[in-house]
Design a protein with these regions (language model features):
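Intrinsically disordered, low-structural-confidence terminal and linker regions
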Residues: 1-8
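Core alpha-helical transmembrane segments of integral membrane proteins
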Residues: 178-182, 186-203, 209-212, 217
Length: 573
């Protein structure tokens, strides 16, 4: 936009409207500037004003003309068609975009040396550490997980911090920015804060040293009584009802509400936290915590927990995924693989992909929703072997088996082996069905990438070899920026099915005692997978009926679930 100086006539109109300036020569305006829409305004420093020629919607169907009324501005740029009114203190050192509505606020200010929460180093998972996660606008769950997991690697840690700092220094604005279409009303204090396009701040108590991202299709809402300090808020997030966020990264489309207090934590992708608190917590994608008593501290949470239930909360059960604890009198019993055939798991498998509310433009964190993958199947293989070893050591006729101080009934142990085996058959059939779509001959993989251990890097399922390669490539300069690292994550995710086939092919041969995989073998494996899938859905149906009898679900929900199970013919994840 080009600006010009005020004319004498415009200055006279402004003065008649009770406006004044330290120096009218420092007030610059657009070519079509209209002074009639400014009243009771005081200007200090360098001022740049856009057009005021349109109405702006301040509430649904309630339009007011753009302009500036009852405000003090110092070193401020105001875009076209903004309405700024009732600024009780002042606006200082800010650039305000087009079509913004700012009303009934106290202070909006940028002070010297601020970084808007970017570059802040926090301690996640380990509160005693010197800090392991660098807050930056590019942060996603994978990058944060890498920082936490390898925080002991000084070379990697320093390299990542330097990358983040270089990027921040390049992009950091000299003063605060309010994006286009932003609405700020009934808010006390906003200092050293960037507000992205189409954000709304309504009734907040304080925003300080914070970057709030936002776009037209993923705007951010910050509501009543919210305090947010030294943090970064991603596209589509919402902070509501007296939430307190300090030294945090809040990811895409996350909701923090109802007095939830978060400190020194990272929260990613579709998480919903209400009433409780988080401290030095790594809340991966789809972390849900809605209890007033919930305390997320020094741990990693997220979608993976929803699939594994009690296992991740009990160290004695970590090697037996999908298991459950029950008590009878003073005895605690372990029921292996119990959760694998529950309606709760079935709901989770189908629910989470549908609940990803992120628009494509705001999907930074990668989330692989496969509940059966090389990562989880490897755990299942080991768990099945543990149960078989217990049976072999104590004998098939033993009434009970002991595992890390927990008792496993004989029937539960046998059922656990069957459930784990059922999952393995479902998985193998699903992989073959997918591969047949583009490789009907089921050719043996020609690469080793995908062999060995796998990891879940906060939603990204990948071979450990690829994860270690990322670490080495960061340290030797092959990956020379945060953007390059993020692109590598995307590339690995895109290769998931190929890596999965490399891992699964030898597993299938070993499981079925084959030397090669023929079309006839594939038909046999898919047939067994379909039978296993039917057994699985029958078990889930029985569990749903139990929930209905206990009053946990109503009859309509039960019928809907049965209808869904009746159409379960696809054995793919």
């Amino acid at each position: 936009m080009t600006y010009r100086k005020l004319t004498d006539e415009e200055i006279l109109v402004l003065e008649n409207n009770n406006c004044r300036a330290d120096d009218w020569e420092s007030v610059n305006v657009s070519d079509d500037f209209n002074p009639a829409y400014l009243r009771d305004v005081v200007f200090y420093g360098e001022i740049f004003l856009g057009d005021f020629d349109r109405n702006i919607e301040v509430s649904p169907s309630f339009l007011k003309h753009s302009g500036i009324y009852s405000a003090t501005l110092r070193n401020v740029t105001v875009g076209d068609n903004c309405l700024i009114e009732h600024v009780n203190n002042y606006i200082n050192n800010y650039t305000i975009g087009d079509n913004c509505y700012i009303s009934n606020i106290a202070t909006l200010e940028t002070t010297e040396g601020t970084t808007y929460g970017q570059g802040n180093i926090i301690s996640v998972v380990n509160s005693s550490s010197e800090g392991n996660v660098v807050l930056c606008t590019q942060l996603n769950s994978q990058l944060a997980a890498l920082m936490v997991k390898y925080s002991h690697d000084k070379e990697l840690r320093d390299t990542l911090r330097n990358m983040a700092r270089e990027n921040i220094d390049t992009l950091l604005p000299e003063r605060g920015i309010i994006g286009d279409g932003v609405k700020i009303v009934n808010t006390v204090e906003i200092t050293n804060t960037i507000l992205g396009d189409y954000c709304e701040v309504n009734g907040a108590a304080r925003l300080s040293d914070t970057t709030v991202m936002g776009t037209a299709d993923a705007s951010v809402f910050i509501g009543t009584g919210v305090i947010c300090e030294n943090s970064i808020i991603s596209d589509g997030a919402s902070l509501l009802n007296h939430a307190i966020v300090q030294d945090c990264f809040i990811g895409e489309v996350c909701k923090i509400s109802n007095g939830f207090t978060a400190g020194q934590s990272v929260v990613f992708a579709n998480s919903n936290l209400s009433k409780g608190e988080a401290c030095t917590a790594f809340c991966g994608p789809f972390t849900i915590s809605l209890s007033k008593k919930a305390q997320l501290t020094n741990g990693m949470y997220g979608l993976y927990n929803n699939f594994h239930g009690e296992v991740l909360r009990n160290p004695n059960m970590r090697n037996l995924p999908f298991s459950r604890l029950t008590t009878q009198g003073e005895t605690t019993y372990l029921v292996p693989a119990f959760n694998m055939t529950t309606v709760a798991l079935y709901r989770a498998i189908h629910k989470w992909p549908r609940h990803d509310m992120r628009p494509q433009t705001a999907a930074r964190s990668i989330v692989n929703f496969d509940w059966l993958s090389p990562f989880s199947v490897d755990e299942i293989i080991k768990a099945k072997q543990i149960l078989e070893d217990l049976r072999d050591i104590s004998g098939e006729d033993a009434p009970n088996y002991s595992y890390h101080g927990l008792i496993i009934r004989a029937a539960d142990l046998q059922k656990g082996i069957q459930n784990y085996d059922m999952a393995l058959r479902i998985y193998m059939g699903a992989v073959i069905e997918h591969i047949q779509k583009y490789d009907p001959d089921l050719c043996e993989p020609t690469t080793n990438t995908g062999m060995g251990q796998w990891d879940n890097l906060a939603g990204l399922l990948l071979p450990v070899s690829e994860e270690r390669q990322i670490v080495e490539d960061i340290k030797d300069g092959t990956l020379e920026s945060i953007d390059a690292i993020l692109r590598r994550f995307v590339e690995i995710h895109a290769e998931y099915r190929n890596y999965q086939w490399v891992w699964t092919y030898p597993f299938i041969l070993n499981y079925y005692g084959l030397s090669e995989l023929t079309p006839a073998d594939a038909d046999m494996i898919i047939d067994k997978a379909l039978k296993a899938r039917r057994n699985w859905t029958e078990e889930i149906s029985r569990d749903a009926e139990t929930e209905y009898q206990l009053g946990k679900i109503d009859h309509e929900a039960l019928k809907a679930l049965w209808a869904h199970l009746d159409h379960e013919t696809d054995i793919e994840n």
